[in-house]
Amino acid sequence: MDAKKKFLCGLFIVGLLGLSSCGGPSSDSEGEIRETQETQQTVQEENGLVYEGSMELQYAENFSVDYYEGGYEMLGTMDGTQILLVPEGKEVPEGLGKDVIVLYRPVSDLYLVSSSVMDMFRELDALSAIRFSAQKQENWYIEEAREAMQEGRIQYAGKYNRPDYEKIVAENCTLAIENRMILHAPEVMEKLEEFGIPVMIEYSSLEKHPLGRVE
């Protein structure tokens, strides 16, 4: 992966993990996501969060990252999913909407179903945030992922349509990162959420620009 793609490929993961980054402005990224951002900002102001700015995206249109005073961040995807990142040692703001997913930093114990995202975690040296994989060790083309599974740092937890609920619940999975295939198995999403495991679908495959798919 060339230097430009390395810089772009992980902006959403950067936001998710609370790493430091910046992107360049682009009018291409201000279309479909603008309404979601405005809705998020209105809701978050009501929750006592003070808006400071947003991550500038060059190509991607299907997600947003907004910054708030105190180190809080709100991630949004095109389906309306909102994830609030709470800084270490801080509390969840009062009055937060019941549909907002809350993650505490440092983020850990993720269940990664969307295999294409693994390379982004690798490039950002953030494999330690992943605890569960929907791919078996022998099926990974990414050497670091194979090694992590061989050493037990990442565990196989079943495919998207047949996750090992017992394992991921027992080991306190914090978030399932799915691809669009999960839309064909809504009962799995419902079951995960029933067990208290929030679900986020990554929509990089819908990005119009090739670089938007890796941003």
Label each region the model flagged:
Residues 1-20:
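Sec-dependent bacterial lipoprotein signal peptides
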Residues 22-118:
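Bacterial Sec-exported substrate-binding components of ABC uptake systems
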Residues 73-169, 175-182, 197:
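A short, structured surface patch at a secondary-structure boundary
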Residues 185-215:
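Charged, glycine-enriched surface loops/patches
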